[in-house]
């Protein structure tokens, strides 16, 4: 039903992506703006401070916001181009309806809303409430994240709600809650500055979080040793004291061996372990056979390097461990996270100045968006939807009977499987491009084609939206008031700079109108985002992610408040666990036993090479926004297959030669980029592109049993040179790949 109404080429011609560039002389009004609005960048969890320059209700440029304490005016390539979206020619300016053989045609808001509500009611009356589903996104503000969770459960009354954080931070979140009872980085990044040893595991921060690199350099200036764990020699690794080129999928073996080494050489904080933790004996028993020799065989890292890393970590007085998707995008991502946490707890270096642990959030509101209830298993305040007391409390805040609160629904990829089985017939998506972001995306496309009705809220027509029946023209971050939460746990203000262009509306107003037409108006009476936030504060009160003491005014006065902040007179909590009282029922941090197991997909004779995926500096997630910005596309026009010279020689592959990549799920071709900065048994593709240039046409849908995150980082493949040299990337048009 939700097939493309016309060819992809015609849709691209009509709605893009098209590239836009600023005029050489800058946009009119850049030098004499009406106002400079202090807000934040939308492109990663750092949420760097930035000033947007506005003239005649249009964003015409930016200035650095040097006073904001995290980035202090610094911006990455994406940050300096983020202002190019507001006036982009691809903006959706009015509601659109599928028109077979034509594409999409404009309709009035009443027509679009009437059609959407009628289809929701039809599907739910015919198949049941859970037959209609919602996929949300964590680039939404805290207010909109909260609103989407409430809308799905109160207005739609469906259990089937999930979000694209399921593809990002959920393994870290599950590990943090198991170990600490709370899901947040333990310290501000300023604590990095005087750490003696820093481990950066599976986090290409120089390209994906460039402004964070500053704090690592500050530590290096003070003599810190830097250890980088990554199968590639990422830019940060080129300057590191020690690079551990781990074989993709073997991270838990590395951290298990380090834990055993720390114990064997008595590099432990016995007082901390004895008085403030549990289950150290179980964690140690799980790794009793994890010798350095065994770890070398499993991980491919020389045992001398593993030993040196363990010695540096064990002997340090202060340390910081950071990780991101490189260890989390696995079918054992939660285990990898817990393996890292175990070596932090073993040395007792948490809850102290310059000692910390944290996961780096990749999406624009990756931290706040995973706290307030648009996950299938979560209620606001990071509460558990299966916990009777949690359900009762939130039902009271929402003014509904607890028995009317839906239960746990499907996670993002499970939802796609449910569509295939015919359980789910309708979908509303916002801020999510699953056709590019989910693994095995040909299967995802087939699911979209089985839907009876699909409505999308977005400001650009992304690849998934091309399958929609109705598209509702939504808003950019700077077109609404709100808050987001940085990767440090700092709640900051998003300030409205301009109105949505044309007949586009704010995301919030769209959802409120849908709720009204679905008969739930009395539960959605917010007049502005601050009223939404104030209800969120109450809903979070007493939860582990407690925002109750945070107000818009307090944020204005301080440039951000760190949660938990349980009372109005509480200053916030920049550094967790200083009192050694953890958020677990017994008040202690919990070690967790982690045993190594193979990835969900292993290499064999037919598919002997490991394919891993990741990001590049100029692109963001599925590329919906960044593949439309000319200067960002110029930096990296199309995905290339990174391959080591030794592996290239083995297969007879030349630089820029087209290479056929084959996996158990599909085959396509990419130009080769021969580099020495990758393991000899591994190739790399960035995942920001759709269609024939998509890395996720190859990735398996093997899910972590706890977090349900897909295994994006390990895929078995084979290579075949095609004997054709690829044309220059700038001429390829891959940014608009079908």
What are these regions (language model features)?
Residues 205-214, 434-443, 482-485:
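Glycine/threonine-rich flexible loop motifs
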